[in-house]
């Protein structure tokens, strides 16, 4: 997935870290073998290479990701799209290498996918390139959290590429308190400090990956699937809290694409706990959804 991972967990005194680390790495390797768009031998890349009309019967992880991705795509009016691989490459934000000459980058590409959820069968309409970079890390966080519970380690904090999930409590009875990273060193807004107790947080923004074009304009790596271009509003960072890191991951991207007005409206209508940070001429401003305000009040 092109990123690193870390975890903190508490267990019995006899716990040996090495077997836990090995089990976590094996689970992550299996996910990468299915969901990664880095390289050419993953299941995702094999789907991208299928001819029109061909399909795959998907294993559970891949099926779970595409199912949630298409739900968020529909609920957001196409602001989230798992079929942006070709578009991302054309803007220079994808993996290194030459893009597939057969790849297409139609707007609202997700609508062309043929997904049979009961059969877990996905059919390639021809030339579409899946890219799960806005959802796969969240799913991996959920999977590792579930694995740790299976290993008898229900008290843990998992982080993959900046997406986090906390489960259980620390030994002193406190939840896992985390501070969400600010969008820039000069951001003077108070830190978003939250307790991750059976809760995940994921963020999307232009503060890490962007480039400057020939006119000196800042181009966000977040692309709008509805226009095929980088988003051009003032949002610098969106953070979403959810029981599932996968859902938080996808929703944060959708809200980032929609912008402050439509993004906050969607968060309110879906009951999402979201923080939207805007970069403005006079400094920084934040918008908090009602669900996040209620959550922060409960923690105060």
What is the predicted role of each segment?
Residues 1-300:
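Mature catalytic core of soluble alpha/beta enzymes
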